[in-house]
Amino acid sequence: MHSKILILDFGSQVTQLIARRVRDSGVFSEVFPYDVSDEFVRNYGAAGVILSGGPNSVIEGDESPRVPQAVFELGVPVMGICYGMQAMAEQLGGKVENGKVREFGYAEVRAHGHTALLKDISDFTTPEGHGMLKVWMSHGDKVNEMPPGFKLMASTPNCPIAGMADEERRMYAFQFHPEVTHTVQGKAIIARFVHDICGCKSDWNMPDYIAEAVEKIRQQVGSDEVILGLSGGVDSSVAAALIHRAIGDQLTCVFVDHGLLRLDEGKMVMEMFAESLGVNVIHIDAVDQFMGHLAGVSDPEAKRKIIGREFVEVFQVEAGKRKNAKWLAQGTIYPDVIESAGKGKKGHTIKSHHNVGGLPETLNLQLLEPLRELFKDEVRKLGVALGLPHDMVYRHPFPGPGLGVRILGEVKKEFADLLRRADAIFIEELRKTPFVATPGASEATDNGIPHRNWYDATSQAFAVFLPVKSVGVMGDGRTYEYVVALRAVQTQDFMTAHWAHLPHELLGNVSNRIINEVRGINRVVYDISGKPPATIEWE
């Protein structure tokens, strides 16, 4: 039986990063909404509990989310983060006030008290000998009086109680966010909590996950047939391989050509899955169906819903041909769930995801989502462990709605054709340009292997079609044609991302090729927005 950490979600948009950091330490963790019952908490079998941040204020009184009382009575270690710290303080007899100075962004925190959690963890030491941590803050309220039994663990000039600890009861809390990459020692702090404070062993790994997931799929599905929408992207590909490992020929993959695929996508998918892996794949041409329903629709949410709805309809028609088809499998992963504020979330919806937001209540198939609790990097590791080709697994992610969310405004076949060719040029140039580190660029992958080229060095790169025209000059003539934006980001978990610092020469080559080779485009721009504030996809 694995050790496991229970994470209670109070609505932070980065709650799942806590789970990611715990898993990085080799310990299994799951996220549940804060309002689970005391009975659930008592029966879960947690080795420790982490309370996430959230958008609410404990000062709101009875209206504010509260920690289940059983959490404080279990006798296992508890760590509160941001709102989790404030809720812990208020419920255990401390006081919280609305801070006069709000703290959002980088901060330097002084450690106090030589606690078991922070002992020997620091980024630098002041001339006075104080250990300091470089952290990320995001709060307005703050604790102004600690509960009985707690001592000061960390402080900043604007937040005198930035961390507190009750070592006897093994309760700890921070006002800053150790789960985000901006907190330099965050990973070490969480590892210390789960290993040293909670006593967990590093006993959660991908081979074990595969064995457990395969068994779970078999129990869930039984002798039923499963159909899966195969896009050729990383998530659906790994989901297909995992499900095929579990139930073999009970899985049928449905590859839908909706006219919004990348260049030569259909050919590649059929060769890879049907011929190389022996998976049952049905190729359906539904271009007219999708384009017809998308005509005149420009709202991003409406487009996503339509594309999701039409996918489901295609699957239902296909399922009707199979008497035993009872399940619709999807490659939904954790970031999809988080941004849709789906099941288990108390956060605010950012945008609907094709995998989790477009399914009507009339769906006649049950959902099978074997990757729902995994981050993107974990999905890739799973794919490699399942024996999928490295280049397939480490291919950049592609959204379920395809180019439909990369064409701003109304989707037209003409726009899709232009974008497909521009995107292919961008990817080709990234692949053939050797990687040389530039300021702000990561020099190696997560496993320490140096990047071969700029495609490897970026986590996701693509072109976006802008439905606006600009004036240009080609030869001796005036042009009035469309604009394409290039987007490339670097990230570990797709929850936050930095724009990729691509070499100017590379960008110049891409721009020249697109303008010269794609008739109908005369201007190329580069997106230098991070996430947040922007999302990775434009729609």
UniProtKB/Swiss-Prot annotation:
Q: What is its EC number?
A: 6.3.5.2
Q: Which GO terms describe its cellular component?
A: cytosol
Annotated ranges, domain GMPS ATP-PPase: 204-395
Under SUPFAM superfamilies, the record lists:
Adenine nucleotide alpha hydrolases-like, Class I glutamine amidotransferase-like, GMP synthetase C-terminal dimerisation domain
Q: Which residues bind ATP?
A: 231-237
Domain of life the protein comes from: Bacteria
Pathway given in the UniProt record: Purine metabolism; GMP biosynthesis; GMP from XMP (L-Gln route): step 1/1
MF terms from GO for this chain are: ATP binding; GMP synthase activity
Recorded hits in InterPro entries, A to Z, give:
Class_I_gatase-like (IPR029062), GATASE (IPR017926), GMP_synth_C (IPR001674), GMP_synth_GATase (IPR004739), GMP_synthase (IPR022955), GMPS_ATP_PPase_dom (IPR025777), NAD/GMP_synthase (IPR022310), Rossmann-like_a/b/a_fold (IPR014729)
Keyword list, A-Z: ATP-binding, Glutamine amidotransferase, GMP biosynthesis, Ligase, Nucleotide-binding, Purine biosynthesis
Active site: which residues?
82 (nucleophile), 177, 179
Give a single Pfam family match. NAD_synthase
Its recorded reaction(s) are: XMP + L-glutamine + ATP + H2O = GMP + L-glutamate + AMP + diphosphate + 2 H(+)
Q: What class of enzyme is it?
A: ligase
The residue ranges of the Glutamine amidotransferase type-1 domain are 4-203
* Function as written in the Swiss-Prot or TrEMBL entry: Catalyzes the synthesis of GMP from XMP.
Q: How does it assemble?
A: Homodimer.
Entry protein name: GMP synthase [glutamine-hydrolyzing]
> Which species?
Janthinobacterium sp. (strain Marseille) (Minibacterium massiliensis)
